[in-house]
């Protein structure tokens, strides 16, 4: 009973002190859920310090010990009502029930109890407790991921095994209608005192779900709301939340073909991301590198090696040198990797830059403004395809001219006439 009593006393103490940060840690289920997720995914917290691993394991052990006591109680609701301050007793009770269900592999029940904990919390939510809102939002997303992984395998352990549920959809609905609305509905005129200061942490969890279920159109409405005059400026939110927000904003811009905006957002996220957050910086680079290559800005080999993105090394080299054959081979070799990260089509579009750099070399070794089309055909045959003909070559040249990578015009089947000044301009992003 001591473990549960200590938990109750700690919750009451933190409530009396209005310590939202401390209370969010005390009520956290993150360590337990991620521990189970990692065991399923065979992930051993690689890259995490031993001290951090020990802290996580200590938290998990504490939760398990407390749960053994909870399972011996006949009426946990009444016990919480008697031991916890009235406005938080339901939250604590539902959380304890969620943990018990989770440890019994009853993922549907665990998910439902966590939603009930959130429903109880938003009724008493105040700005000082925003860290709890963020923690509950994170735990709900992680719980949805865990429950989704176990659909069909452990559903028989649920209280209602006839239920079919889209956990991510249900989680996003709760986050939007309960958590985000709890922050958004505040009409306090002084934004510094408004619950809207808690909104960005919830929005970031929604972003992760929307990208997970490939429903990106829902992100636009959130961005429009967050950047409206009625909300605090982005700079007023915690930096780690701003980094996450701008990362997803950058990814959305990539998807929408807004490459200049994407580069700005992703570059901000990468530069502001702490240097010891190797995993996050690597994730940002996955999308930033293609945006930089679009502008012929080439990352150093040492940077790609540091973040274990060696798949890009030959891509960078082939674009620099205009080596179409090497570019195609690299795309083919690492196709599965690039597809799994959702960047294959973006990289494929860079082929036109490779053509540009190859044809620029042809121009440099040719005297005068009129370059025979045959010169380009020969270069392509040597680099890429013996079967390529003059019509295909003219098509490539036309695309280069149309997209602004080359200034000049084509004299059909005779020559390319290039501009006397800056025929291969520096690449602007769209």
Curated annotation (Swiss-Prot):
> Which GO biological process annotations does it have?
poly(A)+ mRNA export from nucleus; post-transcriptional tethering of RNA polymerase II gene DNA at nuclear periphery; transcription elongation by RNA polymerase II
Query: By what name is this protein known?
Result: PCI domain-containing protein 2 homolog
Record-level Gene Ontology MF annotations: double-stranded DNA binding; RNA binding
Mind telling me which SMART domains this protein's record contains?
A: PAM
Q: Which residues form the PCI domain?
A: 243-424
Task: Give the UniProt entry's GO cellular component terms.
Answer: transcription export complex 2
Which species does the entry assign this protein to?
A: Dictyostelium discoideum
Q: Which family does it belong to?
A: Belongs to the CSN12 family.
């Amino acid at each position: 009973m001591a473990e549960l009593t200590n938990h109750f006393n700690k919750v009451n103490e933190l409530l009396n002190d209005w310590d939202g940060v401390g209370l969010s840690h005390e009520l956290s289920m993150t360590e337990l859920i991620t521990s189970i997720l990692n065991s399923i995914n065979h992930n051993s917290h690689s890259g995490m310090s031993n001290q951090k691993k020990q802290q996580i394991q200590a938290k998990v052990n504490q939760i398990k010990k407390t749960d053994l006591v909870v399972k011996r109680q006949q009426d946990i609701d009444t016990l919480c009502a008697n031991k916890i301050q009235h406005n938080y007793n339901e939250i604590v009770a539902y959380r304890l029930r969620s943990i018990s269900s989770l440890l019994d592999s009853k993922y549907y029940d665990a998910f439902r109890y966590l939603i009930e904990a959130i429903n109880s919390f938003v009724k008493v939510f105040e700005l000082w407790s925003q860290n709890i809102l963020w923690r509950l939002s994170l735990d709900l997303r992680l719980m949805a991921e865990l429950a989704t992984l176990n659909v069909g395998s452990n559903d028989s352990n649920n209280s209602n095994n006839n239920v079919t549920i889209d956990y991510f959809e249900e989680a996003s609905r709760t986050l939007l209608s309960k958590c985000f609305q709890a922050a958004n509905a505040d009409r306090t005129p002084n934004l510094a005192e408004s619950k809207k200061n808690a909104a960005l942490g919830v929005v970031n969890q929604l972003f992760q779900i929307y990208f997970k279920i490939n429903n990106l159109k829902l992100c636009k409405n959130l961005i429009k709301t967050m950047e409206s005059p009625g909300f605090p400026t982005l700079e007023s939110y915690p930096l780690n939340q701003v980094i996450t927000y701008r990362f997803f904003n950058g990814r959305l811009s990539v998807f929408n073909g807004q490459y200049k905006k994407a580069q700005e957002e992703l570059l901000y996220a990468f530069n502001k991301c702490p240097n010891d957050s190797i995993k996050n910086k690597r994730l940002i680079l996955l999308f930033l590198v293609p945006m930089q290559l679009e502008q012929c800005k080439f990352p150093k080999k040492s940077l790609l090696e540091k973040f274990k993105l060696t798949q890009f090394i030959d891509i960078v080299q082939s674009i620099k040198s205009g080596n179409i054959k090497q570019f195609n081979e690299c795309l083919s070799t690492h196709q599965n990797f690039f597809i799994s990260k959702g960047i294959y089509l973006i990289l494929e579009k860079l082929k036109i830059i490779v053509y540009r750099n190859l044809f620029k070399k042809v121009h440099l070794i040719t005297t005068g403004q009129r370059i025979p089309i045959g010169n380009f055909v020969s270069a392509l045959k040597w680099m890429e395809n013996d079967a390529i003909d003059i019509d295909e070559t003219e098509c490539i040249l036309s695309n280069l001219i149309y997209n602004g990578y080359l200034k000049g015009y084509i004299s059909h089947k005779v020559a390319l006439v290039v501009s006397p000044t800056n025929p291969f301009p520096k690449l602007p992003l769209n």
